[in-house]
């Protein structure tokens, strides 16, 4: 069993209700800092960790705790508790050599006057007549006797779901809010064959090139993502130049176009992952292989424009979404190191060495890339370059992934899929 999250923007509240959300998120922010202060000071003075139970007794009479609903306040204390536990776990890794001491920082306070999540556990969640009701403490209602209940429409698709947690998340300095429903997610029984394999090469214009031994190759189009990023970069630069002349770092307009860009990118990524997984289910593909190199974005140097296009596309989000869907439908998910898969010729069965920074591979490959997107094998056969790379990823991971198993469409132009 895993957990899934549905995130929705909170809309159609009154001005007073939005102000209530801001005040509650500020109280949560203040309480987090109070809890963290207690843990830090105890650590500095005693060189020990202040437990959650002890910290609770220190904070329960604090005005920020009293004004928040008890369950929400306790969850905020637990977040501070987990932050320091993570700090101690990293210190343990430093002792074993897995981490450097210089990279481990003690948890810092949140910005004064800022906003923090409202986290509701099961005992504070109330859903009735299609609406989620935000819990408000008695003390807060005494300060605001005329306030109305905050009712948020509850998604119909979650009517039968087992909620684990609900989070109210402030964004853009409290300009808007999202509500996140965390619920139990179960695997589905799917008829798949582990010998049916799909290999995927991630890219930019070709977001995902998919090659299978039971289906013709296809390419998930990434040019729409490039277009969205190109417009966002251009418009953001224009607005920032205006803002800087007025001594501002950001503006409401910059925030709006950034939110819109992020929503569009997230939509394309999720639809792409869903199309790929649906294709796997349709053809009973039981093994999904993704080409991946660690830090392949961090040290990339392919020119200013190409760097911008490549780095701003969230390929890690696509991999995570595919991994989650693979778990859901009992498909084996594999991440394969993909060095030299673009240079090696799949049709000629070239060797596939592994990249080593201290020892460069000096061998020669049978084929070569003669044009953008076109690869020529030793005997002159032309195939799509990304299809060649994707097939090599499958061959590098599975020794039985060979040309005889591939569909005849490998040598033809792969179909291009555009998600809308």
What are these regions (language model features)?
Residues 1-420:
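Nucleic-acid substrate recognition interfaces
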């Amino acid at each position: 069993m895993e957990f899934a999250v549905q995130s929705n923007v909170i809309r159609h509240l009154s001005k007073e209700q939005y102000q209530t959300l801001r005040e509650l998120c500020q109280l949560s922010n203040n309480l987090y800092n109070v809890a963290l202060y207690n843990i830090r000071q105890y650590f500095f003075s005693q060189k020990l960790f202040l437990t959650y139970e002890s910290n609770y007794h220190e904070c329960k009479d604090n005005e920020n705790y009293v004004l928040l609903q008890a369950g929400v306040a306790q969850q905020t204390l637990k977040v501070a508790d987990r932050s320091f536990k993570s700090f101690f776990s990293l210190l343990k890794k430093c002792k074993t050599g897995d981490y450097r001491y210089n990279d481990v920082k003690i948890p810092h306070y949140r910005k004064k006057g800022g906003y923090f999540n409202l986290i509701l556990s099961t005992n504070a969640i109330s859903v009735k007549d299609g609406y989620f009701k935000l819990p408000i403490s008695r003390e807060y209602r005494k300060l605001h006797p005329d306030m109305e209940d905050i009712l948020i429409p509850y998604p119909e698709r979650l009517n039968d779901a087992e909620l684990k947690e609900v989070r109210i998340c402030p964004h853009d300095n409290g300009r808007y809010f999202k509500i996140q429903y965390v619920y139990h997610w179960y695997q589905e029984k799917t008829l798949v064959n582990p010998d049916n394999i799909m290999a995927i090469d991630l890219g930019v214009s070709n977001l995902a090139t998919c090659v299978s031994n039971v289906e013709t190759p296809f390419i998930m189009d990434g040019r729409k993502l490039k277009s969205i990023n190109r417009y966002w970069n251009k418009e953001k630069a224009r607005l920032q130049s205006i803002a800087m002349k007025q001594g501002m770092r950001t503006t409401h307009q910059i925030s709006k176009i950034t939110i819109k860009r992020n929503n569009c990118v997230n939509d394309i990524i999720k639809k792409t992952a869903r199309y790929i997984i649906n294709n796997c289910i349709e053809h009973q593909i039981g093994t999904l292989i993704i080409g991946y190199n660690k830090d392949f974005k961090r040290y990339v140097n392919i020119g200013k424009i190409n760097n911008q296009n490549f780095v701003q596309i969230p390929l890690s989000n696509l991999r995570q979404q595919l991994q989650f869907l693979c778990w859901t439908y009992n498909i084996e998910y594999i991440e394969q190191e993909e060095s030299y898969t673009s240079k090696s010729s799949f049709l000629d069965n070239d060797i596939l060495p592994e990249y080593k920074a201290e020892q460069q591979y000096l061998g020669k490959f049978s084929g070569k890339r003669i044009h953008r997107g076109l690869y020529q094998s030793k005997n002159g056969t032309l195939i799509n370059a990304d299809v060649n790379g994707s097939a090599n990823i499958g061959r590098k991971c599975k020794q039985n992934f060979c040309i005889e198993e591939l569909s005849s469409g490998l040598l033809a132009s792969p179909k291009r899929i555009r998600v809308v």
